[in-house]
Regions:
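Glycine-rich N-terminal segment of FAD-binding domains in flavoprotein oxidoreductases
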Residues: 86-123
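N-terminal glycine-/serine-/threonine-rich phosphate-binding loop
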Residues: 22-101, 178
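Short glycine-/acidic-enriched loop or helix-start segments at secondary-structure transitions
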Residues: 113-115, 145, 209-211
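Ligand-binding beta-strand-loop-alpha-helix segment within the catalytic cores
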Residues: 42-57, 126-199
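Short glycine-rich anion-binding loops that position phosphate/pyrophosphate groups of nucleotides
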Residues: 108-109, 139, 204-207, 213
Length: 224
């Protein structure tokens, strides 16, 4: 027997064991609709949503080494900030109420990128005065000045070496009292409003910012 859901929205019901003929018919139908054709791709209108996501093609660049990858990403970040400033700034007077919003990821992976951005800043290629940053995550409870903090290296390797305004640095506060965490998380989400460009890292299991595979795509900042 198998557990099935009533199409009319009623209670779950127990269905009888399907016949061999029905099973073969079902397999034939699934093979026709849900298998990848030889020429690649899927018939999207016939495939379940999870299969579409599983086989979707995401444009990906693979580099010989970290240096080449860092150069490519740094080029795109510098270009995006410059273009934004050309639109929102004139005569070097910045619209500080509307800075370029850069999302930062934590961990070891982006450190080479952060060092490259610092290098370019010191060479005069880019200014971060009209940039606001939002960090992806943080341990709890902890202070960002502690070496175990997820954001300690962001300060030491990046933020402390550029001309970003202190009020434009947004890091999840790991010192908020536990009974106020939910309220704080909601306010953090509200303060973000938008992200112009996000630097993101993906873990070995596919996790992003402590969001393990299977997390809701519309989930909010929260304690996990």
């Amino acid at each position: 027997v198998r557990l099935v859901n009533d199409a009319n929205g009623g209670d779950n019901t127990i269905g009888s064991k399907p016949t061999e003929r029905k099973i073969n018919k079902l397999h034939k139908r699934m093979n026709n609709k849900y298998s990848l054709p030889k020429d690649g791709g899927l018939i999207s209108e016939s495939a379940p949503r999870d299969i579409i996501h599983r086989y979707e093609k995401i444009h990906t660049k693979v580099y010989e080494n970290e240096y080449e990858g860092v150069q490519y990403v740094a080029d795109n970040i510098v270009k995006a900030i410059r273009m934004y400033n050309e639109i929102h700034c004139s005569n070097e007077v910045y619209e500080e109420s509307q800075p370029f919003v850069l999302g930062l990821t934590t961990g070891r992976t982006p450190l080479g990128l952060y060092r490259e951005l610092v290098k370019r800043h010191h060479e005069g290629q880019i200014s971060f005065r009209n940039v606001a940053v939002y960090s992806l995550d943080e341990f709890y409870p902890i202070r960002s000045t502690e070496q175990q903090s997820r954001n300690y290296r962001i300060h030491e390797e990046f933020l402390n070496h550029i001309d970003i305004l202190p009020e434009n640095v947004h890091i999840p506060d790991g010192t908020v009292p536990e009974d106020r965490v939910s309220e704080y998380c909601a306010s953090y989400d509200h303060s973000v409003r938008r992200i112009d460009l996000m630097i993101i890292g993906v873990g070995e299991d596919g996790q992003i910012g402590f969001n393990e595979p299977g997390s809701y795509s519309r989930s909010r900042t929260r304690l996990v």
